[in-house]
C-alpha cells in the first residue's frame, strides 16, 4: 500500500472513531432523558390515581339539587 492510501485509511478510521464516540455520548444522553421522563410519568400517574380517588370519594350531598339553585342573573 502506498503512503497516501494508508493516510486515507487512517483518516477514515479516525473519522469513524469520532462518530462512534459522538453516538455513544448521544445514546447516554438519551438514556438519561428517558429515565428522567419515566420517573416523571410514574409520579404523574400516582398523582392522577390520588386525584381520581379523591373525586370518587367526594360527598355529593354537599352539592345542591339543580332545581334548588337560584337562576343566574341575566344581563
Curated annotation (Swiss-Prot):
It comes from the Bacteria. Pfam families: SlyX. InterPro entries: SlyX (IPR007236). Belongs to the SlyX family. This is Protein SlyX homolog. The gene is slyX.
Amino acid at each position: 500500500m502506498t503512503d497516501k492510501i494508508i493516510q486515507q485509511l487512517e483518516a477514515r478510521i479516525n473519522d469513524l472513531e469520532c462518530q462512534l464516540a459522538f453516538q455513544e455520548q448521544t445514546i447516554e444522553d438519551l438514556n438519561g432523558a428517558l429515565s428522567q421522563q419515566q420517573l416523571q410519568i410514574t409520579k404523574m400517574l400516582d398523582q392522577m390515581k390520588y386525584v381520581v380517588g379523591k373525586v370518587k370519594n367526594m360527598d355529593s350531598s354537599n352539592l345542591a339539587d339543580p332545581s334548588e339553585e337560584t337562576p343566574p342573573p341575566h344581563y
